[in-house]
């Protein structure tokens, strides 16, 4: 799909207001579009990925288990299932929607400008990271991530920090503490 990937433009309440290309949605100040982040857990630890150096935005930064955009005609769950296969070569079960936020994060001449839902769930299967998407992965406990964020906040994507903060405030976080 490349730069012709079509994304859903939304307002601050996630109401659809149109579509545009991925390139236009991330160029300059960007255009607000629909996205999600997903945290998957196994044995009380969350899967984190380190973004590929090939990424346009925040290459090499630590990120959520997987993340992407919701395409026209897709639900958040369908988008998460699609992306788990692309990024992790894995199938994930239903994920729980725990939080949403709107953010703008510029980097150079590009930016993220998204309405983002945070999805959380358990994962007990095998996976194979897609090297085009990520450099490495690690499993980490919530307390370990909190401590690392305090010491190395710039090592994480802006949406990771917002997603993690919202997740910690949600009742779902108690299940994984």
Where are the model-predicted features located?
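Acidic, metal-coordinating catalytic segment for phosphate/diphosphate chemistry
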Residues: 2-37
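A short coil-to-beta-strand element that immediately follows conserved catalytic motifs
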Residues: 91-100
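Short, solvent-exposed loop/turn elements at beta->coil junctions and helix N-caps
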Residues: 23-27, 100-106
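Nudix hydrolase/Nudix homology domain
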Residues: 60, 99-103, 110-177
């Amino acid at each position: 799909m490349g730069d012709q990937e079509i994304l859903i433009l939304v307002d601050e309440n996630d109401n659809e207001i149109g579509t545009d290309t991925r390139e236009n949605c991330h160029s300059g100040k960007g255009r607000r579009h629909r996205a999600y982040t997903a945290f998957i857990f196994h044995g009380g630890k969350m899967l984190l990925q380190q973004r590929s150096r090939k990424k346009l935005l925040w290459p090499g930064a630590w990120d959520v288990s997987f993340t992407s955009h919701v395409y026209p005609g897709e639900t958040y769950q369908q988008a998460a299932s699609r992306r788990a296969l692309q990024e992790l070569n894995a199938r994930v079960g239903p994920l729980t929607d725990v939080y949403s936020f709107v953010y703008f994060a510029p980097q150079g001449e590009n930016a993220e400008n998204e309405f983002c839902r945070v999805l959380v769930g358990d994962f007990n299967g095998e996976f194979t990271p897609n090297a085009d998407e990520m450099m490495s992965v690690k499993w980490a406990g919530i307390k370990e991530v909190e401590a690392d964020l305090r010491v190395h906040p710039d090592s994480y994507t802006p949406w990771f920090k917002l997603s993690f903060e919202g997740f910690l405030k949600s009742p779902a976080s108690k299940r994984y503490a």
